A protein has these predicted regions:
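Active-site loop-helix segments enriched in His/Asp/Glu that coordinate
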Residues: 85-125
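Divalent metal-coordination and catalytic microenvironments
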Residues: 9, 23, 44, 55, ...
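Acidic active-site catalytic centers that drive phospho-/nucleotidyl reactions
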Residues: 41, 53-55, 112
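N-terminal hydrophobic targeting/anchoring segments and the immediately downstream early-domain regions
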Residues: 45-46, 59-60, 66, 111
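Active-site gating loops and adjacent loop-to-helix segments of metal-dependent hydrolytic enzymes
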Residues: 62-93
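Histidine-centered catalytic micro-motifs
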Residues: 50-61
Length: 125
């Protein structure tokens, strides 16, 4: 089974070693002894258990690129025009994409507020 040992990484204000075997974190502590398949020097790195995004409009992910780098008033005008054409399916797929992006970056929980909340919830499941 694949194993990874991260040595001397910053975790919750202290330097520790983290042993991962397969897809499980097996041990977190000082001076973990294990012959791992891969050893990573974590002395210039930090780890975080998870992130929580407390303000999202996940369904808007598919609007990315509309009026970027514009003043807020112009951006809002463009987004509001686009939102007049929203469908439940659009929100579903936008939320699905947002969830995949959040998982990829370590976000495990989020508070969402957007149109068609039942479709957003369905995408999360």
């Amino acid at each position: 089974m694949n194993s990874i040992l991260i040595k001397n990484v910053l975790f919750e204000s202290q330097r520790v070693d983290i042993l991962i075997v397969g897809n499980r974190i097996e041990k977190i502590g000082k001076d973990v002894e294990f012959i791992a398949d891969k050893v990573i020097d974590g002395s210039e790195k930090g780890v975080f258990p998870t992130f929580v995004n407390m303000h999202t409009h996940a369904g808007m992910t598919l609007f990315r690129g509309i009026s970027e780098d514009m003043p807020l008033s112009i951006w809002l005008d463009e987004i509001w025009k686009a939102e007049t054409k929203l469908t439940p399916e659009f929100v579903y797929w936008g939320t699905k994409l947002a969830c995949l992006e959040m998982i990829k970056t370590g976000t495990t929980a989020f508070a969402d507020m957007y149109w068609y909340p039942e479709k957003g919830a369905q995408a999360v499941e």
